[in-house]
Amino acid sequence: LAVYGADKVIVVDNPVLETYRTEPYAQALTAVINEYKPEIMLVGATAIGRDLGPTVSARVQTGLTADCTMLEIGDFPLVAVPGKEDEQKHNQLLMTRPAFGGNTIATIACPDNRPQMATVRPGVMQKIAPIEGAKANVVEFNPELKENNKYVEIEEVVKAVGNVENIMDAKILVSGGRGVGSAENFGMLKELADVLGGMVSCSRAAVENGWLAQDYQVGQTGKTV
């Protein structure tokens, strides 16, 4: 983490956290926030993040913007209201995400509560070039995790093995949408992708028509590539 810009790494190491469960993870992350009081808390918009993020935001009584596709630091409101310029707040986290089924883009801020929380789609942020020789201050933090009636007991973990290609790893994508017309016609795109050494991807319309699985969807409501 240090080589990618982290100055401090907070480690919570507890056997209870070996396998993800909402309650102990929420307790741990809530304790980290209460102890270190960050201005911003980002969580990956993964299956775990979409469960953990809202739970933690409710416990620390702040807002959360889900599935963000862009993050910026700026002023809120974006344009000062005439006569109320002194009410404009600076250095706010501006969180952009698709809304209304991807038909519009909304920019959201959380000016009155901290931390400012967001879940961010994988692939949105580009890693910086590694900083050779960088070191981070590693802090071990051991909050008390109390077992309560929200705990669940894991009986068995079954790992599914899928054969779906990860389009986020592709250097070349051949993408099709509604105009392709059918699942069969995507075979032509697959042939072209094979020639180019790439993969096939698609739009939301193709997924809704059942032509390709959602794993291949790109765009505001799909994967960021």
Predicted segment positions?
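N-terminal glycine-rich FAD/FM-binding segment characteristic of electron-transfer flavoproteins
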Residues: 1-225
